[in-house]
Amino acid sequence: MNSLVLHRIGVALTCTFFISVTTLAAEPAALRGYNAAIGDSSVSGISSGAFMAIQFATAWSSVVKGVGVVAGGPFWCAQADAIDVFTNYQAPLWHATGSCMVGPPLDLNIFVAKAAEKAASGDIDPLKNIGRQKVYIFHGFNDAVVAKSVTDAAAEFYRHYLGEANRGNLYYQTAIGAGHSLVVLQE
C-alpha cells in the first residue's frame, strides 16, 4: 500500500470515530429561565465583541435597550453576509481586518443603506428602534489596533438614527489615554 492510501484510510477511520462519539453524546441540559424582561436587554463588547454588539443591537433593535461599544465600528463594517464568506471569502476578510480596523475613514452611507435594505426585507428589526437605545462608545486615544476613524463611524451611525431629539442617548468618550483596552477605575 502506498502512503496516499494509508492516509485516506486514516482519515476515514478518524472521521468514523468522531461521528460515532458525537452520536453517543448526552443531550445537553435545558437552560433555566431568569424571568428577565427581554425589552430591557443590553449588549456590549470590546474590539471584535464591540463590532458584534453593534450588529446585534441593530438587528434586534426592538429588544435592545442599551449598547456598550469599546473600540468597535459601525453596522455591516465588514460589508459581508454569511453567504459572502463562501462566494468571495477574501473581501470580507480584507474589510474586517483592514478598513474596519485601521481606516481609511468609512463611508456612513454604505452602512445606512445596507441597514435600510436589511430592515425593508425584514432581515432585521425596524431601524426606528435604534433611536430609543442608550449608547456608550469608547475609544482610547492611544489605541493602535482600531483606528479612531472606525469608532467615529460607529458614533456617526448612531447619530444618524438617534436624530437631534435623542442625541443625549449617545455618550462618546475619546479623551482618555488608553490603548486597546477596557478602562477600569482603580481605587
Question: Which functions belong to the PLM regions below?
Answer:
Residues 1-11:
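Bacterial N-terminal signal peptides that target proteins for export
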Residues 37-42, 62-66, 131-136, 166-171:
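Loop/turn elements at helix/coil->beta-strand transitions in domains of secreted/extracellular proteins
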Residues 21-25:
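Sec/Tat signal peptide C-region and signal peptidase I cleavage site
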Residues 37-85:
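Primarily recognizes the serine-hydrolase "nucleophile elbow" in alpha/beta-hydrolase
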Residues 72-128:
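Mobile cap/lid helix-loop segments that gate and shape the active-site cleft of serine hydrolases
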Residues 27-38:
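Conserved acidic catalytic loop of the alpha/beta-hydrolase fold
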Residues 136-138, 142-144, 152-187:
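C-terminal catalytic histidine-bearing segment of alpha/beta-hydrolase fold enzymes
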Residues 10-20:
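Bacterial N-terminal signal peptides
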